Amino acid sequence: QSGKTLKIAFFLNLGFTILEFFGGIYVNSVAIMSDAVHDLGDSLSLGTAWYLDKKSHKEADDKYSFGYKRFSLLGALINSIVLIGGSIYVISEAIGRLFEPQPSDAQGMIVFAIIGVLVNGYAAWKLSSGNSLNEKTVSWHLMEDVLGWVAVLIVAIVLNFTDNQYLDPALSILITLYILYNVVLRLKETL
């Protein structure tokens, strides 16, 4: 069951990541482009988590006399490391936009934010009933993505009424700092 939910989450996230890259360029939003890079890392992590989860269900053999259950923990560790790397990239991009602000297409951001809430929310819901630490780590991260998209939606609505070009990168930094905080907590749990 866990492999099936990880598979669904993987393909949803990968498809949405591709859409985000094109959409972020189209609406000129660093928050959406940053999230696309972040979601690419998530897709890689989900793919790894899916593979390692399948591996963790193998029976013990001569090579691994206690079985493969620890592969699920390895998936959580890899997930955390990828998220830390992606977060560092996101912060560096957003800081650049604070010094050289650029206008974003607020209407386009609203559309992507709604899609982001729906896609990530569905994937998080599918994984929320998981039993492995790997599934729980992925589910928590997808819920953080939902919160990030809600914040993007709020900022996009505000941008409809103002011309504050600092909101997009500032939001990107806040979301990323929140994600980093939670990843470090889960990384400690994994180790």
Short names for language-model regions:
Residues 22-35:
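Short, hydrophobic transmembrane alpha-helix segments
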Residues 42:
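Acidic (E/D-rich), amphipathic helical modules within compact regulatory domains
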Residues 1-4, 8, 31, 37, ...:
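Alpha-helical transmembrane segments and adjacent TM-loop junctions that form the membrane-embedded core
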Residues 1-25:
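Histidine-rich, glycine-flanked metal-binding segment
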